[in-house]
């Protein structure tokens, strides 16, 4: 894992232990949400929040240096904080659609599984660079990570200038 990050800056992880049934259940609820009518989905769009939680419709996000918005809509799921958390004022609570049964359970379940996997990766990377295994733990334990299921619509015209998602970098790094 350390070599992959040194050479490429990322890696693909197989054998991670997240059950395929859990991944499939999350994909199912995400697909059912994106299939809802636009006016229903827009109930979950939080204007002025930068899409930190809930739904972001088509035409909102534009990649850096692009003239046209990306052809995608997405949903953000983030960490659920204890009520008295000192981070509550900077990390919005999650929003859960009422129209899709199981969305919260499957969506947040996958978020938690991926968050735990991320912690395992950080422990491995810490050891790779000769740090204590738990070096990153107190630096990320309340991090504002997100799970972002994205829906890319079918492209129905050949002359559109947009791309589904323009070239980009992780904005928080």
Region roles according to the model:
Residues 1-173:
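Peripheral, non-catalytic segments flanking oxidoreductase cores
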């Amino acid at each position: 894992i350390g070599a992959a990050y040194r050479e490429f800056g990322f890696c693909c992880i197989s054998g991670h232990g997240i059950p395929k049934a859990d991944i499939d259940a999350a994909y199912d609820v995400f697909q059912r949400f994106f299939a809802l009518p636009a006016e229903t989905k827009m109930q979950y769009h939080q204007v002025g929040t930068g899409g930190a939680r809930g739904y972001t419709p088509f035409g909102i996000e534009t990649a850096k240096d692009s003239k046209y918005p990306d052809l995608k809509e997405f949903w953000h799921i983030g960490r659920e904080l204890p009520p008295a958390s000192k981070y509550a004022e900077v990390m919005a609570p999650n929003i859960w659609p009422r129209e899709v049964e199981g969305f919260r359970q499957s969506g947040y379940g996958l978020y938690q599984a991926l968050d735990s996997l991320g912690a395992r990766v950080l422990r491995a990377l810490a050891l790779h660079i000769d740090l204590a295994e738990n070096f990153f733990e107190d630096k990320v334990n309340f991090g504002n990570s997100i799970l972002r299921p994205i829906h890319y619509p079918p492209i129905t015209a050949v002359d559109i200038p947009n791309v589904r998602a323009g070239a980009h970098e992780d904005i928080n790094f």
